[in-house]
Amino acid sequence: MLKKKLKVAVTGSIGSGKSTFCDFIAEKDYPVIKADDISKQILAGDKNVKEKVIKKFGDESFINNQINKKFLAEKIFSNPINVIIINSILHPEVKKKVQQLMQEQLRNNDIVFTEAALIYEAEMEDMFEYVILITAGSSVREKRIIANGKLTRDEFKKRNENQIKDEEKKKRADFVFENDGSVEELKQKADFLITVLIGLGSSATASSRNT
């Protein structure tokens, strides 16, 4: 048992490999809260949120009470103002839910991780002792996203443009891991991070963010 329990965020731009990194952490039996999943659950199930989204983006935002992902994505990422609007609706609710889930997980775990692409955009960094940034070159990230069929090149570029650049994130993150290599190399970095965090928790060293 660690002297200090730790809340740790894992972030990174689209296609950086943060989800794969978190999968390796989860394989070690550490809880990983996925902010993107929470956001989708809130959008689909929170009546007040749905009403705000429909008011801003129209009735087509939902079909048969289900999220119209294609319509909303086109609406949101076609205009930076719409990104700000949807974030202002979702981020406060996501932050509350993440806080709740972290507290629940810390009852039985020394370290809880949260995977979230928009840690800095949502101003969530002060919720955590440490923020971990996973980075990769823009061309590498683009190839990954297109290869797995998630987005077209144009869709990738639109979403990438609406995220804070890695250069700025690197200045604010506590740990930065490059992910331009193999999956095995990324796994080794995840293992290394866990070892470091256990050491920090054992010595009760907190980040300057929460001291």
Sequence positions of predicted segments:
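Walker A (P-loop) phosphate-binding motif
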Residues: 1-37
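An amphipathic alpha-helix signature
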Residues: 50-54, 138-143, 153, 157
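ATP-dependent NMP and nucleoside kinases share a basic, alpha-helical "lid"
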Residues: 99-107, 111-147
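Small-molecule kinase domains that catalyze NTP-dependent phosphoryl transfer to phosphate-bearing small molecules
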Residues: 97-98, 105, 126-127, 147-196
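ATP-dependent small-molecule kinase phosphotransfer cores
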Residues: 37-110
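Hydrophobic "anchor" residues on beta-strands that sit immediately upstream
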Residues: 7, 32, 111, 125, ...
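N-terminal polybasic phosphate/anion-binding patch
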Residues: 20-23, 31-44, 59, 77, ...
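A short, charged, Gly/Pro-tolerant segment at domain boundaries
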Residues: 199-211
